[in-house]
UniProtKB/Swiss-Prot annotation:
PANTHER family xrefs: BROMODOMAIN-CONTAINING PROTEIN 4, FALZ-RELATED BROMODOMAIN-CONTAINING PROTEINS
Signal peptide location: none
Any GO BP: chromosome segregation
PTM notes: Phosphorylation by CK2 disrupt the intramolecular binding between the bromo domain 2 and the NPS region and promotes binding between the NPS and the BID regions, leading to activate the protein and promote binding to acetylated histones. In absence of phosphorylation, BRD4 does not localize to p53/TP53 target gene promoters, phosphorylation promoting recruitment to p53/TP53 target promoters.
Biased composition (Polar residues): 1075-1084
Changes seen on gene knockout: Embryonic lethal. Embryos ndie shortly after implantation and are compromised in their ability to maintain an inner cell mass.
Protein name: Bromodomain-containing protein 4
Outcome, altering residue 440 to A: No effect on acetylated histone binding
Domain NET: 601-683
């Protein structure tokens, strides 16, 4: 009674009850726990009896489950405290409680009855629970807190009862005496008193044993009065034999329950029998140990979760040794009771948080929800029963969950790593022994997913693998013994888990809280990653031979351990890169080209700068482009680097770029770009494997990613996935680009002063080829190029460093001359101003130094092409287009690099002629384009991509002045020279005559080549220095720049623009607007030449003109100088090696833009260009609406720049033409050119050479007309073919109709003839029939003949008038259809758009 009052007082004090509800709560508590009859106004009735010596005792598997699972779970519930002891009506001041409640009941009484084997069957126990809840509902009001608490408990109770074993089987009771003794020891003199202590003990024991499953129930407070019992319970797992725990646990054998550990006392009892059936005390000890697992001894499934100890008790003697070995501490495996008692104290000592989590993980693996696929791993493999005679030979270290549980409870694991190693060893054994498609392997994968998910949530990141196989030696013996009895192993595992949980109550409470948090996290993860299993299985299958522990440790911990190593390694690698890149490498550390150590996170994180939103967006788009077979590697990269996603399902992984580490994003970027490069490389690298491949990679990456992202990703990708290739290609391609720049500056250190001198320009003709050769040569200097490999942003920001590193001397010139040759070659792209001024200065030196190179370039166009494509990769936006040019000869690379723009649709129609003409020249273009690409890359690489493009365009304008024309021609020749060395010699003289123009033409060639300016910067810089030449080129350059800059979206298109060869469909617009402006400028400078060229181009438009015009106009070289124009026209007609390059440009454009195909070339070549600068932007875009969209975007952008920076664009351009002081003006022109380059070009051309403008416009119109006619013809032919087919079908139908009509007529005739002359009619009918048949056959033949002739007249008139009428009808129908079909609205709209464009 006193004890009861104590609990009652606690109840009042507990905060769970509301203030106003204390009485009701107390009453509820009393009602629930009412052990005493309703005697109590002043005194409480005696509690219900918990034992009856006269009543036979009985233990069943269901009762065991009720004790170990149901009662244990309810006892630990936070609302259980009011029901843990009989209602104390005196303390709670409930005088009427026992009057209303005649059969009081509480969980404390139920627990004692279960422990004392009081119930005969489970129904009696369930009835007591129902009585307890009913009493609460009867006595208390519906809304009271105590009622709500009872409802919550009842709900949980019903859930657990649903899992009750279906069949009730009796279990031997070996512990009756022990239990009685235990009670006596505990001193249960009074039933009431004994009930309270039992309750407290039970509550404490469950807390200690199963802290993980449930939070410590409030009952713990009540249980404190019996601290002596709690220590016993804590010690119980090991010391289960101890008497004090036994009294509490004596009744526990009845309920076995694996899932909830709340009923620790009963479980120990059950677990004991399996371990030691002979000795009652040992059984008790084991009860405490195996609370959970022993619950379902009778059922096979239950034993898996929690093997029932009571049911196997008879078998326990056999299994005892094995079980004991698994359960007890290593030393006393067989002496379970004693050894467990001793280990008990050890276990009572604090277990590390990680090991506590391990115990929780193991319990979850034993849970019923996983039983469907976990059951094969519950017990050691029974080699004899399964007939697996070779198992022990293959599997040297068997392992199973029961063995792991016993080792965990016996404290054999020093840390979580050993535990994880054994679990993974168990799975790896399964994967090793069984075939991959075996169902057991699938089950192991599922279970391992559960394990890994929980193991990853370990509090202190204990996942660091400590590949420790300490357990294997022990597990094999246990396994060998274990196979005989499954129930024993299950019971052992349950007892082990219970014992592992047995610690001080405080530890339990902490554990429970932690475990709940972990469970929540795990559930959230499971929900998010619905299928993480497949990923793990794949890894495990791969590493079947390797132990799971080792593998995971390597993956998880090795990464962390290697992080420090990687920090050290990256410097070494960077050193290598620096050595390879020399000057450039220093800047690359930021991109961190950690090719070998992509796996090292710390290193990469240190080096990898975070991705911008644009980069992440581009990366997402690129990942979506990858083929299915490449996505597995993406998932692997993410999972290997992101601990939170390690257990995610690879098939349904969800990637949030915001949560991924920078190193992971960069690694993904490298991989994706490398994959995309591989797709495009085959074509791009056909010409130049080393340089081309890296540049193509860069190009593809730039296409897919922003400029900065593409460059960084390129470097990273080459480093990570293609360490060798990245070194070669990265250095050769990217680095070659920069190296070429560097080498050019170095080659041009002397030319640097020349930039402003006109003489250097004459020398420039040779330099363009040398740039190409230099590009070829740069591959050898890839070491320095590693720096260029840096991201495009790095390139932009680091151009000065590159310049300084490569040509310190040249750098000074840069400041002085606005652009130093070094700047151009090294990072001319970085400095927009450089391209304008220094392009001219450096170009002469380059050309002068590389005249030989020019010849070499001709010889080695493929290598140059490779270099060029690589260069484009750097100036992610503009260089990308250029790379396609070099690749273009292969025809594959263009598709790879530029297909994104709009190349594909246009390629369909006009490209045929262009391709025919241009493809042969493609190789020459490659050499020229190599040079141009290097230059363009350099220019494009300048700090701002837009500026680089402007530079390119600004330089192309220089051709506008007459002096530039020769230079332009020379440049064209130079590009051509690669195929024919003789043409190169010609360009040099022209350049000499007009040094500034030549540089200008080089820029325009870059323009056509899409930014040959980078080459012109070295070679052109001298050209720009000539004031007369430079001002005009900037204007043409403006359109190009505009296009190129705006093309940032059409990144690649802009390149095609500048270099029509670039195989980019967008080129049509580009050709018209950029090339046209340049051409116009050229035309103005040399009207006769332009006129000649446009005419020639018009004549040879189909073949030479496309290439030539594109080259000439796009580059501005041919039109630029009078000599150049004739050269272009001549070369265009005979797609000579020199011409091929221009042809390539045109080809690209034509192919890409169907509408512009025929006309764009002529337009670009003709005086129309002036119109195109402004008008063509829209008109050209209109024809190529799909393809031109990028161009349209670019052009609008171009116009604003022109307006903003070049409002004085026209005057500036004119000034540039007149003044050689383009160094400073070009910068302004860069923007102005973008804005008013087209307008200024249009104005310039009309102002300077009106005759040329007219001639060009005339030729352009002719070209348009020819193109229109050609298109109309093609459409007409198509329509005719379609009509013919339709007519054939009609004829067939008509034949059928005519036959029917004839039959009807024949019948009518027959009737009339029969009336007149039956005989004659019959004869006539026969004849008619024969005739009709013949006629039908004839008609069919005629129809067949006429069907092919869709538009031809209908078959000859039929004998029948009706037939003739029908045929006439059909003919009319056909005519109508033919007329309707001839009118193609799409075709008409295209024609109108072309016409409107021409009007401008």
């Amino acid at each position: 009674m006193s004890t009861e009052s104590g609990p009652g007082t606690r109840l009042r004090n507990l905060p769970v009850m509301g203030d106003g509800l204390e009485t009701s709560q107390m009453s509820t508590t009393q009602a629930q726990a009412q052990p005493q009859p309703a005697n109590a106004a002043s005194t409480n009735p005696p509690p219900p009896e918990t034992s009856n010596p006269n009543k036979p005792k009985r233990q069943t598997n269901q009762l065991q489950y009720l004790l170990r699972v149901v009662l244990k779970t309810l006892w630990k519930h936070q609302f259980a405290w009011p029901f843990q002891q009989p209602v104390d009506a005196v303390k709670l001041n409930l005088p009427d409680y026992y009057k209303i409640i005649k059969t009081p009941m509480d969980m404390g009484t139920i627990k004692k009855r279960l422990e004392n084997n009081y119930y005969w069957n489970a129904q009696e126990c369930i009835q007591d629970f129902n009585t307890m809840f009913t009493n609460c509902y009867i006595y208390n009001k519906p809304g009271d807190d105590i009622v709500l608490m009872a409802e919550a408990l009842e709900k949980l109770f019903l859930q657990k009862i649903n899992e009750l074993p279906t069949e009730e089987t009796e279990i031997m009771i070996v512990q009756a005496k022990g239990r009685g003794r235990g009670r006596k020891e505990t001193g249960a003199a009074k039933p009431g008193v004994s009930t309270v202590p039992n309750t407290t003990q039970a509550s404490t024991s469950p807390q200690t044993q199963t802290p993980q499953q449930n939070p410590p129930p409030p009952v713990q407070a009540t249980t404190h009065p019996f601290p002596a019992v709690t220590p016993d319970l804590i010690a119980q797992p090991p010391v289960m034999t101890m008497v004090p725990p036994q009294p509490l646990q004596t009744p526990s054998p009845v309920p076995p329950q694996p899932p909830p550990p709340p009923a620790p006392v009963p479980q120990p009892v059950q677990s004991h029998p399996p371990i030691i059936a002979t000795t009652p005390q040992p059984v008790k000890t084991k009860k405490g140990v195996k609370r959970k697992a022993d619950t379902t001894t009778p059922t096979t499934i239950d034993p898996i979760h929690e093997p029932p100890s009571l049911a196997p008790e008879p078998k326990t003697a056999k299994l005892g040794p094995r079980r004991e070995s698994s359960r007890p501490v290593k030393p006393p495996k067989k002496d379970v009771p004693d050894s467990q008692q001793h280990p008990g104290p050890e276990k009572s000592s604090k277990i590390s948080e990680q090991l506590k989590c391990c115990s929780g993980i193991l319990k979850e693996m034993f849970a019923k929800k996983h039983a469907a696929y976990a059951w094969p791993f519950y017990k050691p493999v029974d080699v004899e029963a399964l007939g697996l005679h070779d198992y022990c030979d293959i599997i040297k270290h068997p392992m199973d969950m029961s063995t792991i549980k016993s080792k965990l409870e016996s404290r054999e694991y020093r840390d979580a790593q050993e535990f994880g190693a054994d679990v993974r060893l168990m799975f790896s054994n399964c994967y090793k022994y069984n075939p991959p498609d075996h169902e057991v392997v699938a089950m192991a994968r599922k279970l391992q997913d559960v394990f890994e998910m929980r193991f990853a949530k370990m509090p202190d990141e204990p996942e660091e693998p400590v590949v420790t196989v300490s357990s294997p030696a022990v597990p094999p013996p246990t396994k060998v013994v274990a196979p005989p009895s499954s129930s024993d192993s299950s019971s052992d595992s349950s007892s082990d888990s219970d014992s592992s949980t047995d610690d001080s109550e405080e530890e339990r409470a902490q554990r429970l809280a932690e475990l709940q948090e972990q469970l929540k996290a795990v559930h959230e993860q499971l929900a998010a990653l619905s299928q993480p299993q497949q990923n793990k299985p794949k890894k495990k299958e791969k590493d079947k031979k390797e132990k799971k522990k080792e593998k995971h440790k390597k993956k998880e911990e090795v990464e962390e351990n290697k992080k420090s190593k990687t920090k050290e390694l990256p410097p070494k690698k960077t050193k290598k890169n620096n050595s390879s890149n020399s000057n450039v490498s220093k800047k690359e550390p930021v991109p961190t080209k950690t090719k070998p150590p992509p796996t090292y996170e710390s290193e990469e994180e240190d080096k990898c700068k975070p991705m911008s939103y644009e980069e992440k967006r581009q990366l997402s788009l690129d990942i979506n482009k990858l083929p299915g077979e490449k996505l597995g590697r993406v998932v692997h990269i993410i999972q290997s680097r992101e601990p939170s996603l390690k257990n995610s399902n690879p098939d349904e992984i969800e990637i949030d770029f915001e949560t991924l580490k920078p190193s992971t994003l960069r690694e993904l970027e490298r991989y994706v770009t490398s994959c995309l490069r591989k797709k495009r490389k085959p074509q791009a690298e056909k010409v130049d494997v080393i340089a081309g491949s890296s540049k193509m990679k860069g190009f593809s990456s730039s296409e897919s990613e922003s400029t900065s992202e593409s460059s960084s990703s390129d470097s990273e990708d080459s480093e990570t996935e293609m360490a060798p290739k990245s070194k070669k290609k990265g250095h050769t391609g990217r680095d070659q680009k920069k190296h070429h720049h560097h080498h050019h500056p170095q080659m041009q250190p002397a030319p640097a002063p020349v930039p402003q001198q006109p003489p250097p320009p004459p020398q420039q003709p040779p330099p363009p080829p040398p740039p190409q050769q230099q590009q070829q040569q740069p591959p050898p200097p890839p070491p320095p190029p590693s720096m260029p490999q840096q991201t495009a942003p790095a390139m932009k920001s680091s151009p000065p460093p590159f310049i300084t590193a490569q040509v310190p001397v040249l750098e000074p010139q840069l400041p002085g001359s606005v652009f130093d040759p070094i700047g151009h070659f090294t990072q001319p792209i970085l400095h927009l101003p450089q391209p304008e001024l220094p392009p001219h200065l450096p170009q002469p030196p380059e050309h002068s130094t590389p005249p030989h190179l020019n010849q070499h370039a001709v010889v080695s166009p493929p290598a140059l092409h490779n270099a060029l494509p690589q260069q484009p990769s750097r100036p992610s936006n503009r260089a990308a287009a250029l790379p396609p040019k070099p690749t273009r000869p292969p025809a594959v690379s263009p598709a790879l690099a530029q297909p994104p723009l709009l190349p594909q649709p246009p390629m369909a129609q006009p490209p045929q002629v262009l391709l025919e003409d241009e493809e042969p020249p493609a190789p020459p273009l490659t050499s020229m384009q190599m040079q141009l690409y290097l230059q363009q890359l350099q220019k494009v690489q300048p700090p701002t991509p837009l500026l680089p493009s402007v530079k390119v365009q600004s330089q192309p304008p220089p051709p506008l002045p007459p002096p530039p024309h020769p230079s332009v021609q020379q440049q064209q020749l130079q590009p051509q020279p690669p195929p024919p060395p003789p043409p190169q010699p010609q360009p040099p003289p022209q350049q000499q005559h007009q040094p500034p123009p030549r540089p200008v033409h080089l820029p325009s060639m870059p323009f056509s080549a899409h930014i040959q300016q980078p080459p012109p910067p070295p070679g052109q810089q001298p050209t720009h220095p000539p004031p007369g030449q430079q001002p005009p080129p900037p204007q043409p350059a403006k359109p190009q720049q505009v296009i190129q800059h705006h093309p940032s979206p059409r990144h690649h298109k802009s390149d095609p623009y500048s270099a029509g060869h670039l195989r980019e469909a967008p080129s049509p617009l580009m050709i018209h607007s950029p090339q046209m402006p340049q051409f116009q400028s050229l035309t103005h400078q040399s009207p006769p030449q332009q006129n000649v060229q446009p005419k020639k181009q018009v004549k040879g438009r189909a073949e030479p003109q496309p290439p030539g015009p594109v080259m000439g106009q796009g580059q501005g070289c041919p039109p630029a100088s009078p000599a150049a124009v004739p050269m272009l026209s001549q070369e265009l007609r005979p797609p000579s090696v020199v011409q091929p390059q221009p042809l390539v440009v045109v080809k690209e454009e034509k192919i890409h833009s169907p509408i512009i195909r025929s006309e764009p070339f002529s337009t670009s070549l003709r005086p129309e260009p002036p119109k195109h600068p402004e008008n063509i932007k829209a008109p050209v875009h209109l024809p190529q609406r799909p393809e031109m969209k990028p161009v349209d975007i670019g052009r609008p952008v171009i116009r604003p720049p022109e307006q903003s920076a070049p409002p004085p664009g026209a005057p500036d351009k004119d000034k540039q033409k007149q003044e050689p002081k383009t160094p400073v003006a070009p910068k302004k022109d860069l923007k102005i050119k973008n804005m008013g380059s087209w307008a200024s070009l249009v104005q310039k051309h009309p102002t300077t050479p009106s005759s040329t403008a007219k001639s060009s416009s005339d030729s352009f119109e002719h070209f348009r007309r020819a193109a229109r006619e050609k298109e109309e013809r093609e459409k007409a032919l198509k329509a005719q073919a379609e009509h013919a087919e339709k007519e054939k079908e009609r004829l067939r139908q008509e034949r059928m109709r005519s036959r029917e009509d004839e039959d009807a007529l024949e019948q009518a005739r027959r009737a009339h003839e029969e009336a007149r002359r039956r005989q004659e009619q019959q004869q006539q009918q026969q004849q008619q029939r024969q005739e009709q048949q013949q006629q039908q056959q004839q008609a069919a033949a005629v129809a067949a003949a006429s069907a092919p002739q869709a538009q031809s007249s209908q078959p000859q008139s039929m004998l029948d008038q009706q037939r003739e009428l029908a045929r006439k009808r059909e003919q009319e129908r056909r005519r109508r259809e033919a007329m309707a079909a001839t009118i193609d609205m799409n075709f008409q709209s295209d024609l109108l758009s072309i016409f409107e464009e021409n009007l401008f």
